[in-house]
Amino acid sequence: MLLLGSMWVSTGSFPPMVVVESKSMMHEDDGSLGAIDPGDLIMVMSNDRADVVTFVEATEEGNENFGYESHGLPGDVIIYRKNGGTDTPVIHRALLEAVANGSGWDVPGTSLSNVQSVSWTLEYDCSYHGGTYKLRIEAWEPEHAGFLTSGDNNFGGCMVDQPSANSQGQGGGLVDFQGNPVQPVRDEWVVGVASSEIPWVGSIKLLTTGAAGSVTMKSWNYLALTILLVLASPIAFEYFPTLHTSPEEEE
């Protein structure tokens, strides 16, 4: 309880950590350190304490956030509720943000200012049909101010979570528990920003809830090794020699 309370104070979020269930943020098929894989525990920093840096801001030369990375790619990963609903939150990367400007839209991290629709090519690689191309947002008219988001696992072609921003050839996007298309993520729908990662440990919870199907064999192996090392460490310390200094030697 003391540890949980200290993490709550540190992050400003409760619960202060979430367990990742899906493969949507994986960078490699069998998982990798630094990326977000099924079974990882992710510390959630309150968005009141951390400003969200989008992918386009982190990849724009001259921007104050240029070069910033989180969990293996530029920009922050956010945890949000689809359309502000009560279904399981999504943990995906913030690609860009549409900010209202009079009758138009600004997109921080780009040259777009007071535009009626958003068209922009991101330096975001997508693998599709054996080739690689850049993610393109084409003539997107935001329903309201908010973030466009996407999972990092784009080996089957890039898909933006918000269907209204997906160009032809991309996936259909996400829907909420009522079947409504997910809209741009409002600030108040953001649960927090993904911070530190504890790999593999959350697999235990997924196993107990019957949701461990996405956890890779590599993660199970590393988890088993971690548990063995923790259990063996007290025994190992028993065999370490204890150094004594006699009073005569001290003189």
Label each residue range with its predicted role.
Residues G109, S113-S119, E123, Y128-H129, ...:
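Long, low-complexity, polar/charged, intrinsically disordered or flexibly structured peripheral segments
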Residues V115, L207-S219:
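Short, surface-exposed polybasic-and-hydrophobic patches located at secondary-structure transitions
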Residues M1-M7, V230-A232:
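Single-pass alpha-helical transmembrane signal-anchor segments
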Residues T216-E251:
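Juxtamembrane interface at the cytosolic side of transmembrane helices
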Residues A139-T209:
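Extended, hydrophilic extramembrane loops/domains of integral membrane proteins
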Residues G67-S70, D125-A145, D176-G179:
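Intrinsically disordered, low-complexity acidic Ser/Thr-rich regulatory segments
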Residues L4-E123:
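Feature for secretory/organellar precursors and membrane-associated catalytic proteins
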